[in-house]
Amino acid sequence: MNPADHPSVYVAGYLALYGADESDELNIDRKDIRAAIPTPAPLPINIDHRRDCTVGAVLALIDDEHGLFFLGKINCPVMVRTLETAASQEIFSELDNLKPDDKLLYIITNYLPSVSLSSRRLAPGETADETFLAHVALCLLGKRIGTIVTYDLTPEEAIEPFRKLSPNSKATLLSQGKETERLLGEMVWYPSKNAITKALLGTAVNNMLLRDRWQIISERRRMAGITGQKYLQASSFTALTDSMTSNNVSVTHPICENANPGNIQKDEEMQVCISPAQTSETLNAGVLSGCNDFHRLPHSDPASTSDQTNLQSLIEPSMNTQSSRPPGDDFIWVPIKSYNQLVSRNASQPTNIPDIAITSNQPPFIPPALMNTSISGQHSIPSGYAQYGYPTPVGTHNSLLPLGPVNQMGGFQYGPQVYPLSYGQSPLEAKLTALLECMTKEKRPVDEEHRGDDMHTTREERGRRGRKRPYEFDRSIESDLYYPGEFRRSNFSPPQASSMKYEETTGGRHDLSQTGPVLNSLMGAVTSLQKEVERLNGGNLPISNAQSSYGVPNGMHAPVYYSYPPPGTHPTVSWPMGVERPMPSTEGKTSTNSTVIPVPVSDPEAGRNVPITATISQERSDGIQKESIEQSRDTMNASAVAGIHRTSDAGVDVFINQMMAHQ
């Protein structure tokens, strides 16, 4: 590897700030520094205090009034090659025509932004000497406060960002650095590739869990008085891409427990957006506008000292003082440039909704107490206010609109309720208002129709009548749903006294003449189903010539089966028609406690209603229920398999009860 392909990199910064560290172990007395410098030989520069990874040497050490400052030189092609190959070129995709040297400075500045001084431990009562300082290590974050370094290609540019450094100190550094560099010559450091790789990887691994490291670096950079640094990502001038600018963190003022407020240097290059009231003459060259991220601050000269003082007096009280930092972590510092852009962008956007209270010429609305009775028709009130249910039309802000009728007493029909509405309704609000108005109009006729009705009486009357079923419950003309067996009158004539008396004695049952047609239709359907079941069983019932015990000729009876034949019985063997089937008894005797009820049935063949004989008793019904339960254990029942409660039995019971109630 040719060293000429990779030029030397100069590094500069404070190794320690006097009085900044409260820890006794990290705090260095100034008298010890004065006793230790100048060193007999240039101190080596390594990475993370690894002695086998030396990459440069210290050129100059000075005792500045703020702390120990150094200037060093790094000339290690192995480290440069490792960083260049490890870094992705996509980092610089947004930067055009960037030189390889600038890329190297970006990488090394952000990968090793801090420095750490290694010094010998002094025994109690021991004084420092020339062997007190051991070496200088490049690292991500040093333990001492304010130990942020800068990298550049020349010694002058490396020490330029340190504004706290006095001109005499800068001159001493440059002179000592040139002398040491002349003694070293073109010295190149070649650590092993394995050592440099472990050192660079260890820096990333050891600090990967460091929280808010860029914020800490930014604060320590300000403590060191670094302004206008070009390559450090934590500085305000670093901008690899628009999304990677550090303006959001660089404006954070240094707040640290161990920081000395007297040693904190205030930022002198705050970005200021020139307002129309300001001119280029009012802003000196000491303040950058923020448009050019790679320009440095010019050197301060005595001629412009008074102007810079006046300018700083305008900037520092509001933005650059430590006392202006809000308490807690709920606030952020925003650069003036970004803030002015937001304000100007917001001011340039026109508002879509005009302020009617400002643009309107009409007087403020005063609700009327009581209107004159001579006023008829509709009452006009200013737009923006409307009676409930009468929305204000959109787009008529400067006109008086008729809003709602009034009664003869001068007030509103629903009371003087006036509600302020918004200046303009959205489509959804307009639809809701229209729907509410339609519902109000439809409800009004219904209320007038039922006014005075029995269903709209007082609570006491409804409570007394609720104990009995009203004889005239169906008053509406709508076709309400009804269940089988219930009857609904087709006419709405007032009930007679005889019907009221009949209802009280029969418990609300209707007469047979009204329920007959419905029951005839239902019985015809049942008869058809019975005939279909008979056909599916495959057996023709034998016709008997015997007469029934009630004098009814044979052939006039409809077959009535109370249950299917039990298993094992021949399907053709059945009880003769017209003959009453004996009720099975547990004692082997035929039950005599039975009731014969003639029920009219529609005979499709005869075309007229004929009576059938149905013998029903309590013991027979109990026997049928037990027999059905025993059969359900041997047969497939869809409702039982489905696991749903059976409702067919309840329907049959209701049907039979309705039939028996109207006889």
Curated annotation (Swiss-Prot):
The record marks A234, S235, A638, S639 as: Cleavage. Residues 444-471, 486-512, 583-608 are annotated as: Disordered. Residues 329-348 are annotated as: Interaction with pAP. One of its GO terms (molecular function) is serine-type endopeptidase activity. Residues 643-663 are annotated as: Interaction with major capsid protein. It comes from the Viruses. Residues 501-512 have a biased composition (Basic and acidic residues). Keywords: Host cytoplasm, Host nucleus, Hydrolase, Phosphoprotein, Protease, Serine protease, Viral capsid assembly, Viral release from host cell. One of its GO terms (biological process) is proteolysis. The active site is at H49 (charge relay system), S116 (charge relay system), H135 (charge relay system). GO terms for cellular component: host cell cytoplasm; host cell nucleus. Gene3D superfamilies: Herpesvirus/Caudovirus protease domain. The keyword Protease applies. Belongs to the herpesviridae capsid scaffolding protein family. Region of interaction between pPR and pAP is called Amino conserved domain (ACD). The region of interaction with major capsid protein is called carboxyl conserved domain (CCD). This is Capsid scaffolding protein. The lineage of its organism: Viruses, Duplodnaviria, Heunggongvirae, Peploviricota, Herviviricetes. The gene is MDV038.
